[in-house]
């Protein structure tokens, strides 16, 4: 994957999540472009959010954990048959939150990060904390970087 400068400190917050079989299954799900899995995108968002929140003096643990689980929807979003009745763009945060609640104990900040990460596309899911705004911004930035970087 990537060579993160502060990998060990970051892993203190997320290693338990990363060892979960459902989180690992995200490696099999495509994300924004070919060759990038939902897992790899989520780790990149999580790490970037953790660094920014740590620098800002915010809850870096919540940013790391919420960032890792922000796309924990567990279906192939490119295959409509794998998620019947779900409008992926607007509803996947709710699916991700439901899946995360079923497997992990979440703080209110982690829940808000997952639920509001698509704002303003989901205009009724406004950030309730700064960590959510950071993760949402890092999600959009990472998606743009993944789309535009050479293969």
Where are these regions (language model features)?
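All-alpha prenyltransferase/terpene-synthase fold signal
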Residues: 2, 6-9, 119-124, 142
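Cofactor-cradling patches in redox/metallo enzymes
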Residues: 136
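Active-site micro-motifs of SAM-dependent methyltransferase domains
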Residues: 70, 74, 120, 143
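Acidic/His-rich, divalent-metal-binding segments that scaffold phosphate/diphosphate chemistry
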Residues: 1-79, 85-86
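Histidine- and acidic-residue-rich, metal-dependent catalytic cores
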Residues: 25-53, 62-63, 90-124, 130
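Conserved small/polar residues in nucleotide/adenosyl-binding loops
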Residues: 147-151
């Amino acid at each position: 994957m990537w060579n993160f400068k502060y990998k060990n400190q970051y892993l203190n917050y997320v290693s338990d999540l990363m060892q979960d079989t459902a989180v690992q299954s995200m490696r099999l799900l495509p994300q924004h472009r070919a060759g990038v899995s939902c897992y790899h995108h989520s780790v990149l968002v999580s790490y970037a959010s953790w660094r920014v929140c740590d620098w800002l003096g915010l809850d870096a643990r919540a940013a790391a954990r919420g960032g890792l689980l922000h796309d924990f929807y567990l279906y192939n979003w490119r295959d409509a048959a794998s998620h019947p009745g779900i409008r992926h763009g607007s509803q996947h945060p709710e699916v991700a939150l439901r899946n995360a609640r079923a497997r992990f104990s979440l703080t209110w900040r982690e829940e808000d990060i997952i639920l509001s990460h698509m704002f303003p596309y989901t205009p009724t899911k406004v950030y309730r904390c700064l960590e959510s705004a950071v993760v949402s911004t890092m999600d959009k930035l990472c998606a743009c970087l993944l789309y535009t970087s050479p293969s």
